[in-house]
Design a protein with these regions (language model features):
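ABC ATPase NBD coupling module
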Residues: 30, 40-55, 82
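Conserved catalytic motifs of ABC-family nucleotide-binding domains
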Residues: 131
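Hydrophobic anchor residue at the start of the ABC signature
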Residues: 124
């Protein structure tokens, strides 16, 4: 796990969206310079490869729900179904993602009935179900209790290690995130400074 810390307005979300490949095709803006992520120039993956390789979970979970499902299970299935995976594979991914995020009890609930913290965990489950090589979490713990954050960080750390995936956390506060990261950076004045 890698963490990038920064104050409000420091550019954390912009950097997260750039890493996710959202610029310039999905968000307006001008990019100068070049960079690579997962051995590919940023923003050059075809959409189907991008969604299967990189997932971004943002701070506002309600904006990331599809709006076209009637249960948490259907919401978590939405991404893998769009990859045209076999039904058995989709169900296995749903089960694993719901278990990892402690969302099994929410499986048959309508997404509109969830609390903020529950919705945040479901959106993370949706990203996990895509089995990305890179999972970007942009203040994705903001609505979780400290206990839920610790539990999820431990499970995500194990998940990333087992899969060989990279998780990049974008956060304002270092606690408890710094304890789970192999590298940490401070984003300030448009530059990244190493913390450890």
């Amino acid at each position: 796990m890698v963490a990038i810390f920064g104050d409000n307005g420091s550019g954390k979300s912009t950097l997260a969206q750039l890493m996710a490949g959202w610029y310039p095709d999905f968000l307006p803006g001008e990019i100068t310079g070049t960079g690579t992520l997962l051995c590919t120039p940023i923003g050059h993956l075809p959409l189907n490869e991008q969604s299967a390789t990189i997932q971004l979970v943002q701070q506002s979970p309600y904006l990331q729900l599809s709006g076209c499902t009637f249960s948490v299970e259907e919401e978590v299935a939405f991404g893998p179904e769009n990859l045209c995976l076999a039904e058995a594979e989709i169900m296995a991914r749903i089960d694993a993602a719901l278990t990892l995020t402690d969302c099994q009890p929410l499986r048959h609930r309508h997404p509109a009935t969830l609390s903020g913290g529950e919705t945040q965990r479901v959106v993370i489950a949706c990203a996990i179900a895509m089995q990305p090589k890179l999972l970007i979490l942009d203040e994705a713990f903001s609505r979780l209790t400290p206990q839920a954050s610790e539990m999820l960080l431990q499970r995500l750390q194990h998940w990333a290690f087992e899969r060989g995936s990279l998780i990049i956390l974008f956060e304002r506060h270092r606690t408890p995130f710094l304890n789970y990261c192999q590298q940490a950076w401070q984003l300030q004045n448009g530059a990244l400074q190493p913390l450890c």
